[in-house]
Curated annotation (Swiss-Prot):
Induction: By stress conditions e.g. heat shock. It comes from Treponema pallidum (strain Nichols). Acts as a chaperone. GO terms for molecular function: ATP binding; ATP-dependent protein folding chaperone; unfolded protein binding. Keywords: ATP-binding, Chaperone, Nucleotide-binding, Phosphoprotein, Stress response. This is Chaperone protein DnaK. Residues 601-635 are annotated as: Disordered.
Amino acid sequence: MGKIIGIDLGTTNSCVAIMEGGEPVVIQNAEGGRTTPSIIGFTSDGGRVVGQPAKNQMVTNPEHTIYSIKRFIGSRFNELTGEAKKVPYKIVPQGDDVRVEVEGKLYSTQEISAFILQKMKKTAEDYLGEAVTEAVITVPAYFNDAQRQATKDAGKIAGLDVKRIINEPTAASLAFGFNKDSKREKIIAVYDLGGGTFDISILELGDGVFEVKSTNGDTHLGGDDFDARIVQWLEQGFKSDTGIDLGNDRMALQRLREAAEKAKIALSSSASTEINLPFITADANGPKHLQRTLSRSEFEKMTDDLFERTKEPCRKALKDAGISADRIDEILLVGGSTRMPKVAHVIKDVFGKEGSKGVNPDEAVAIGAAIQGGILGGDVKDVLLLDVTPLSLGIETMGGVFTPLISRNTTIPTRKSQVFSTAADGQTAVSIHVLQGERGMANQNRTLGNFDLVGIPPAPRGVPQIEVTFDIDANGIVHVSAKDLGTGKEQHIRIESSSGLSESEIDRMVKEAEANAESDKREREKIEARNVADSLIYQTEKTLKEAGDGVNAADRARIDEAIAELKTVLSGDDVASIKAKTEILQQASYKIAEEMYKRQAAAGAAAGKKSDAPSGNEAEGGDVDYEVVKDEDSK
């Protein structure tokens, strides 16, 4: 069995870790980063880039750069509540489902997420030097069944067998408590404010057991929302100053978003920050520049309601766990957004104590996922993880009432059954409407699925015995069955992702991903070859300029010709030609370097001989060096 990697699939950034020698290790990506931006860029020539290269094209190609896809995964189109209008790329419906449209092609949210997971998979494979096929992937604790299933599907499309879906706060607690020799039970809270989601979990740790007591959160609250407030402030200020509305200029908006994120980060360590965006737009009078100063107090004022929104889930989680705030031993801060200083005030207000920086907020979740992978793979012993389901599960009963079978914060895996009956005389079939949520009426909760149990013998209302069983696995994914106890007839359903991907669609996407792996590799090779060539041209031209007359005319002509030929092939896509012409220029540039080195060595030798000749004072027998030392000593 190969290694099981741990992946934190984040809204803003993703991270991958592995267990090595009994310890979790965060793996650097090809760009040298320990985290990878969760961004996919589609290039003009039909290529695709992921991570930092995609982030680099956000301003110049906003419509084809996909970010924060986690906010949409597992959602129906009618559930997006205006969020689709806040991104520069195109979100469109396909039936009830959400799709991303790029150059006329539709992508599911799972496919987009799979591109990020493929990047994390490749990062791990490059590090390990072997194929990786198994992973533990994290999700926000408050993700519903559809979002969990969609994340699992994304893993499958990326070529990964997802061994476990684990809640992010739970993973962070594993990172915190792993290898800590503590027999004393400890109660911790994990306050996880990421790029797009917020979770709070209350856990009990002790003697290798990590037991989640309760969880709560908001899957539409995170760093993106804080950035959006700064963007709004910049837009309004610029319109007030110039009369120009930047809201319809996608490129300008993307520059505002980038500047907003940088300003937010700067305000975590500074009392104020300058936002300078030259040439943000232009009118009949010429180019316009944006320059504003944002203070931390102003930022905290404009986002106060967002910070406040994190308090109520914390209080609910404490109440559900039956634990008072003063019994919490430690509050772990997880997610990059917890670096905002105002978070410390929120923590103090709710829990009455300071938050702990006992884990790296950007890496703890991936580390915990790797530890979970180690547990599943048998590399980590004596650790037991007991997680919970975040939302109640049940069915619709007569009168449109929601009847829960499994209450929220029930430890998983779990199985619960309840017997129901028919609502009308002679009824031969029942429709089972499966829901998830906390509201009293069925139509106020989220539909997970519908199925029918048919073939019930006609009988008076209330006589047939229909046993409905809910089964939640360790991933938090729901399976439901209904059985007529009189006839033994049974109907099963595994609740599929609400994104509507069938098994055949997932298989098709897996095959597409495998087919594209080769073209992606070719695209990477092309980009790398171009980068090497561009760098060599720049360096060679710089060397020629510095050398001046030091390079003879014949050598210079040969190098100029090699540069011209390389520039010509760079205008095409033939990687072999680019590499061949790069090699020719490389050899020619080596010759210049060799000649220059010889010249410098000869000049150095000549200078050495000159310095070996006696100076005027030495020729006269003067004792200059000795006199200087004496002068220093006498001071």
